[in-house]
Regions:
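Structured beta-strand/loop patches that form or line metal/cofactor-binding pockets in enzymes
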Residues: 1-42, 46-55
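Structured loop/turn residues at beta-strand edges in well-structured enzyme cores
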Residues: 1, 101, 154
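Glycine-rich anion/phosphate-binding loops
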Residues: 26, 96-104, 141, 145
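Generic structural "secondary-structure junction" signal
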Residues: 15-17, 21-28, 56, 76, ...
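Metal- or metallocofactor-binding catalytic centers and their adjacent structured scaffolds
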Residues: 7, 37-114
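N-terminal amphipathic alpha-helix/helix-capping segment at the start of soluble metabolic enzymes
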Residues: 1-10, 21, 87, 112-113, ...
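Metal-dependent enolase-superfamily TIM-barrel catalytic cores that perform enediolate-based chemistry
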Residues: 121-182
Length: 182
């Protein structure tokens, strides 16, 4: 099945509440989107929201790369060759992990929708499900405990806790969080 169109765009979205990690506080997020449309109308969707401080790329940079001639040249290619297309993108965007991710995800999504399989089934899922974790950012103990209670109400059973500001406080925070979500 041929790829007939690719579209990319950038969206800025406010977070429901600020999030602090590694000395930064975020109140909104920018996400680069890539749509890969097949001849039968199926649209695969990929996204990237890289942090420049971590990988040297921003969502804005990803959006520019996703609008490049290289990505536009996916039009006319066969989605059945998605693995080859991903390898070509990895080589072309060698030091741009966000751009690579958006292309990889969009192509996997389009192919999966075409063959009626989830991406995890295409990749060879061996187990049925894993619990999804949720991250508690850098915040005070009372705030972390309140957030953990809210996450537990939402059904989360695995917490990822950001630490590093104060060792004694971090130890107390982790111990008290384990009382809420063992």
């Amino acid at each position: 099945m041929k790829i007939v169109a690719v579209r990319s765009y950038l969206q800025h979205m406010a977070l429901t509440k600020p999030y602090s990690i590694a000395g930064y506080t975020f109140s909104d997020v920018s996400i680069a989107f890539l749509e890969v449309e097949l001849a039968n109308g199926i649209i695969g969707l990929g996204t990237a929201s890289p942090a420049e401080e971590v990988v040297g790329e921003t969502a804005e940079m990803s959006a520019v790369h996703l609008a490049s001639d290289f990505v536009q040249n996916l039009v006319g290619r066969d989605i059945e060759d998605f693995q080859q297309l991903i390898q070509e993108a990895r080589a072309h965007f060698d030091h741009l992990p966000g751009t690579q991710a958006a292309i990889d995800i969009a192509l996997h999504d389009a192919y999966g929708l075409l063959v009626g399989k989830s991406v995890s089934a295409i990749l060879g899922r061996k187990i049925q499900a894993l619990p999804t974790s949720v991250t508690i950012g850098l915040m005070s103990i009372p705030e972390a405990l309140a957030e953990a209670r809210e996450f537990k109400k939402l059904g989360f059973t695995v917490l990822k806790v950001k630490t590093g500001e104060n060792v004694e406080e971090d130890i107390e925070k982790v111990i008290r969080l384990q009382e809420i979500v063992p």
